[in-house]
Amino acid sequence: MTLDFRAYAQSLDLARYPRTPHLEGSRLQDGDEGHDHVPYRALAGAHLVVEEKLDGANTGISFSPAGELLLQSRGHYLAGGGRERQFGFVKTWAAAHAGWLLERLGDRYVMYGETMSKKHAVFYDALPHHFFEFDVFDRATGRFLSTPARRALLADGPVLSVPVLYEGVAPARLADLKALLGPSLAKTPDWRRAFEHTVRRQGLDLARAWQQCDKSEQSEGLYVKIETDDTTTARLKWVRHDFVQAILDSARHHSEQPFIPNL
């Protein structure tokens, strides 16, 4: 990718994915200082869509007014370089399906998803894909589409979405919502053996790799959306406490850790 394109990409308006506040009882992580928890009672009567919170890299896919494919992560466009290794799959996949994506997204929509090619804190051994869509932003209205609206927009195509665990009125108690937390749908009971095999195949130190890996069977947490018929109006996350402890115990951010591929 040329320096000219990098400069051009950075000049484009980037729709950054909004920060997600924590729900009552969720364990705060580094960078969350100063952000209060949202009380569960604030969700009373709301229509919720609850998803498994996957541990990957936030990625956006969109198109310029000239129809050029653009990929972004957090606050910048992906413009090449060694630090973008984990995005290699999604770059190839998006380019292969650029025609279909352009037809659905145009320069109006930004599709956000989780890129799962590299292990962050959680190792997955049963991923059906390495990109999972979870939100679509409408530049024309300044709103995020509801789950049914996203499904309609992306129907009959190559896009997989994050697992949905519940759709309906907010459960009466926080405990009822937390009961949705269970083993990750993207891990098998044999994931530990698969992890060790992958680490050895990569020629990495197994003890250190385990130090930098979440050891729980449970998913990272829950991602909760508040929706109307056509719009996602708010989103919250609930992260289990021992997941955050696993991050602290690793002593190194995932971006500084060796590349261990998810399966």
Question: Predicted regions: what is each one?
Answer:
Residues 2-263:
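Core nucleotide-handling region used for phosphoryl-transfer chemistry
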